């Protein structure tokens, strides 16, 4: 028995991430010995049949050794109650219950502590689990689950139904009569142990045995892990029918976590060092062995608050994942890794490859304890992990200020946005007046008279002099011209989601796909692009005939309103971009297919209608445009509007852009782009360069980015504008925060495309409230 000194982290920080608090070597192999951890104690078998209890609160206490088993101990578990703290151990001969406090008192008095024998079995017990009140205990032996009464020391019920050995079992916290088990038959079952009946049986989840089980009480979810490093999260809410919420591959999540950190480091370095970092990233991205899920434990991760130098008041619900070579912290809201601790990075650890693992962390605590047994040796070690030090090393490096959608500084003279401001700051009044006179003459219809008379032969019409109206009656009513048909109503926060179909309109006589749609800024118009080359504009109430815009030779793929609601932008599969006049329903600006080398995938108005922002191939382009309102009635077919490319920038990876987004309702310097390499890149057009890269945002390329662009009817916190959504085929919808480039939440939707409405369903997803999102600490 030895207790080595504290070991500093390998990254050069003076604050130790991992401290090996206790090490013991057993006479028997410690490859798969059962381990148990509580908030104050750690229990493990020593030399096969001796049960040892180590105090994590006061390591100076003598190691408590409990003897009573004659065979190898195969299962150990602590009770859920603190006073008294119960400990149960099982072997092939006995199942013994121990009172930890009484056993320690007897040891201090020189007496031999004795436990209570609950029963004797001839089969190997693989799992033990107490109920919440410690009055019952579930014993898993073979494919059978026995629920025993602790006080009466009798078997209450036996549950049979698994085809393989039961590996883990849990009591449901909010349903006292419900018990859930997983087995080597690769399925989980839900039982009512009061009546001894089976409630639900899942299908086979994987080709590998299920090893662990955890119930998240706050979200009412079931988490189970397999031997090949896969996690399944199922909903236990009433009416959800145990549907799968998420499927997590720990190995892929670890690769994504590592790639994002290295991409962030690459963006923060000078350009001459980026090639070397990319080469190192390719070398580190080699495939490794899978991570078997040895243990699962809850973790209330309090993110560091840079302003206070402590922990934030709000904690993120996470999950400890113990594997053979590493420990991981998984965010249960976003299903992304918050931290990864690899044993090989700490060479002085006694256990480098674990055969068994157990973890525990107290709520609102900065420390966690982990217990490991050596796979290829006989050592058992207790590690103390400093969460604050671990998280500080796991943060993405960032060079410069924190990103924000709201512009926090003036436009730089070197910015491409500076061009548009200069041109509009000093308008030429003389030219404006001439255009106005010219438009009055040219906009008149052309009329051919049958009789032409010379001037002077007819009398001029009498002009009516101005006479003010003095008999106007005011009825405290607004003119019908300015009458607002949409009355403001106070919406209930509890029932604000629409649930019933209000109105349905057919956009065409034949079935046609609605490929895109967008409301105008005031919410009174709805534009949609169709697969039959048309663009339609409806009233928000879908009443009356729509305005039709025809001109594309292919399906309309993008449609966008201008901020002043005068113009409508559309792109189609004919590789053209068109700007329409909403009032005239006429084409005002045309970008031919040969304007760009590759098709335009996304386009929108930008910077309060000053520019047109579009993507073509691997780069996005900023266009300065001018709409000529002076139209010759004879040459109506020939638009005189013009455009000029002023700035373009490619993605860092060189991948083609699949979607882009920027705010047009107010001045913002941020542009978001998504590429076919499954990455999202953030560009700062004030600096004219890339600001950040989010690697492997989805398992498939992102086909849609949606930002919080504000509303004229709802007041929001300024930080709420930094939230944006991404969607990918078959990979759900994810909510991100631009301030720290973190995934905040993830939802799964059945529709393939969130903007295609043919043969799909519209699902309203509930996200975390604004207060919950704003309560998260800002990045340093």
Swiss-Prot record:
Pfam families: WD40. Keywords: Repeat, WD repeat. The keyword DNA-binding does not apply. WD repeats lie at residues 3-56, 61-100, 111-150, 154-193, 200-236, 291-335, 342-385, 500-540, 544-582, 588-639, 644-685, 691-738, 752-779. Gene3D superfamilies: YVTN repeat-like/Quinoprotein amine dehydrogenase. Signal peptide: none annotated. InterPro entries: Quinoprotein_ADH-like_sf, WD40/YVTN_repeat-like_dom_sf, WD40_repeat_dom_sf, WD40_rpt, WDR27. It comes from the Eukaryota. PANTHER family: WD REPEAT-CONTAINING PROTEIN 27. This is WD repeat-containing protein 27.
């Amino acid at each position: 028995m030895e207790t080595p000194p504290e070991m500093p982290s390998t990254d050069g920080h003076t604050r130790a991430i991992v401290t090996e608090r206790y090490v013991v070597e057993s006479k028997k192999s410690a490859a798969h010995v059962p381990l148990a951890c509580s908030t104050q104690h750690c229990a493990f078998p020593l030399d096969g049949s001796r049960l040892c209890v180590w105090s994590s609160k006061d390591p100076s206490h003598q190691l408590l050794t409990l003897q009573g088993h004659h065979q190898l101990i195969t299962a150990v578990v602590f009770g859920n109650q603190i006073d008294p703290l119960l400990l149960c151990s099982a072997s092939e001969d006995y199942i013994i219950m121990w009172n930890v406090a009484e056993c320690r008192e007897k040891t201090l008095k020189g007496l031999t502590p004795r436990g209570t024998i609950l029963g004797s079995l001839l089969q190997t017990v693989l799992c033990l689990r107490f109920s919440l009140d410690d009055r019952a205990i579930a014993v898993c032996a073979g494919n059978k689950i026995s629920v025993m009464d602790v006080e009466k020391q009798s078997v209450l019920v036996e549950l049979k139904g698994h085809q393989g050995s039961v590996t883990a079992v849990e009591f449901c916290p909010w349903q006292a009569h419900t018990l859930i088990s997983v087995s080597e038959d690769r399925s989980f079952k839900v039982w009512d142990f009061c009546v001894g009946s089976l409630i639900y049986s899942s299908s086979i989840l994987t080709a590998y045995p299920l090893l662990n089980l955890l119930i998240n009480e706050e979200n009412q979810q079931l988490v189970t892990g397999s031997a090949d490093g896969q996690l399944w999260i199922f909903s236990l809410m009433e009416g959800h029918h145990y549907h799968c919420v998420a499927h997590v591959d720990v190995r892929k999540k670890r690769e994504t976590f590592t790639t994002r950190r290295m991409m962030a480091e690459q963006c923060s370095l000078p350009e001459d060092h980026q090639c070397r970092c990319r080469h190192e990233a390719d070398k580190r991205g080699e495939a490794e062995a899978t991570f078997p899920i040895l243990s699962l434990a809850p973790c209330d991760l309090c993110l560091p608050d840079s302003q206070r130098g402590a922990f934030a008041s709000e904690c993120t619900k996470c999950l400890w994942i113990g594997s053979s070579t590493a420990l991981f912290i998984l965010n249960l809201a976003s299903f992304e890794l918050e931290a990864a601790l690899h044993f090989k990075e700490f060479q002085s650890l006694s256990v480098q490859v674990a055969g068994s693992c157990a973890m525990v962390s107290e709520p609102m605590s900065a420390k966690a304890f982990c217990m490991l047994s050596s796979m290829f040796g006989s050592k058992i070690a207790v590690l103390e992990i400093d969460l604050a030090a671990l998280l500080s090393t796991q943060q993405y490096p960032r060079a410069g200020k924190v990103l924000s959608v709201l512009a926090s500084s003036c436009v730089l003279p070197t910015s491409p946005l500076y061009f548009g401001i200069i041109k509009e700051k000093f308008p030429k009044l003389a030219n404006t007046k001439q255009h106005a006179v010219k438009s009055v003459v040219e906009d008149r219809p052309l009329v051919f008279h049958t009789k032409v008379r010379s001037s002077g032969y007819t009398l001029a019409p009498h002009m009516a002099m101005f006479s003010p109206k003095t008999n106007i009656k005011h009825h405290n009513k607004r003119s019908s011209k300015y009458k607002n048909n949409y009355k403001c109503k106070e919406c209930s926060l509890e029932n604000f989601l629409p649930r019933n179909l209000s109105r349905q309109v057919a956009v065409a006589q034949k079935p046609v796909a609605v490929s895109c749609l967008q409301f105008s800024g005031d919410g009174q118009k709805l534009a949609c692009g169709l697969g039959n080359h048309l663009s339609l504009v409806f009233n928000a109430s879908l009443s009356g005939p729509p305005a039709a815009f025809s001109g594309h030779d292919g399906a309309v793929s993008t449609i966008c309103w201008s901020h002043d609601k005068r113009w409508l932008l559309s792109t189609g599969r004919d590789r053209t971009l068109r700007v329409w006049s909403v009032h005239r329903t006429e084409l005002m600006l045309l970008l031919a297919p040969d304007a760009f080398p590759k098709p335009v995938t996304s386009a929108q108005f930008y910077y309060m209608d000053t520019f047109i922002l579009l993507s073509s191939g691997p780069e996005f382009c900023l266009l300065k445009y001018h709409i000529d309102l002076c139209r010759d009635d004879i040459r109506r077919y020939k638009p005189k509007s013009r455009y000029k490319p002023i700035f373009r920038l490619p993605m860092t990876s060189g991948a083609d852009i699949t979607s882009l987004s920027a705010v047009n309702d107010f001045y913002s310097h941020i542009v978001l782009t998504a590429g076919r390499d499954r990455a999202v890149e953030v560009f700062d057009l004030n600096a004219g360069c890339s600001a950040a890269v989010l690697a492997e945002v989805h398992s498939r390329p992102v086909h849609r980015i949606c930002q919080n662009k504000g509303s004229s009817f709802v007041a929001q916190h300024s930080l709420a504008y930094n939230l944006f959504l991404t969607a990918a085929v078959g990979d759900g919808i994810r909510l991100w925060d631009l301030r720290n480039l973190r995934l905040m939440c993830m939802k799964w939707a059945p529709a393939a495309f969130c903007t295609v409405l043919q043969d799909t369903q519209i699902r309203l997803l509930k996200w975390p409230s604004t207060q919950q999102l704003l309560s998260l600490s800002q990045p340093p």
